[in-house]
Amino acid sequence: MFTIVKRRELNPTVTELCIHAPLIAKKAKAGQFIIVRAKEDSERIPLTIAGFDREAGTVSIIFQVVGAGTMQLNSLKEDEAVHDFVGPLGKATEIEGLKNVCVVGGGVGCAIALPIAQALHEQGTKVTGIVGFRNKDLVILEDEFRACCDEFIIMTDDGSYGEKGVVTAPLEQKIVEGANFDEVITIGPLIMMKFVVKTTKPHNVKTVVSMNPIMVDGTGMCGGCRLTVGGQTKFACVDGPDFDGFEVDFDEAMHRGTMYKPFEAHAREAECNLLKQEVQ
């Protein structure tokens, strides 16, 4: 049984679950993901591992409640169990030998960026963290980032917390001022990662992006997570999720990401109706 040992609401729409999964915790590395099903009839949800404790045998996942599957997952309480919890899947983020790295996260993507920043910090890498949110109420994991970053910058769209603006502004400034990053690692909305790459490419700063497209089985069989990288078809679940940002076709990825929106909306509405019936 994959029991929820701890539950934490990070903001009104983002939840962290700490799940007892000793075999996964034993092998997990930063950048890898799991696939979870809340209940037997739930959809399979790929989520990048947000943290793990090998001694306690626990794995943390962080998700935003956006559809029927995440609504069902969010309905589970401490001491209850998820139906399936499979992993670790995908390739770990390659960080060996890096001396100076900028980690750029956006929104709930910061949950994926955090374990990478922590792993970099643990190996002695200088870490500059830049994270962006729409407003103060949506800021997550600030204390955790500050603990592992040599420099940490928070950006909000409306200026209600940290600095006003988007993550590319301080990133550009750091590069122009001669930060000499070995690599920029960015995780967040596709449009954000696209513009991070547009910022770094003219300066020839290697940029790694974490791609999280539609995914079903997590083993390369369904082909749902296919991407075009360097003119070739790649599968995020087995070839990634990390890719060279200079090579990713972001426009195609964004188009594919909208293909199932009507179905997702229908499923969410149906789940809301079921929850209303349970309350009544």
What spans do the regions from the language model cover?
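Ferredoxin-reductase
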Residues: M1-E78
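Structural signal for conserved beta-strand scaffold positions within catalytic alpha/beta enzyme cores
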Residues: K6, G51, I154-T156, V209, ...
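A generic structural signal for residues embedded in beta-strands
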Residues: V36, D84-F85, L227
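Short, Lys/Arg- and Gly-enriched loop/turn segments at beta-strand edges
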Residues: S42-G51, L89-K99, C237
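FNR/FR-type flavoprotein reductase catalytic core
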Residues: M71-V216
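Local cysteine-cluster metal-coordination motifs and their immediate loop/turn environment
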Residues: I112, L190-I191, N212-D242, A270-K276
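Short Fe-S-cluster ligation motifs
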Residues: F235-D239, F243-Q280
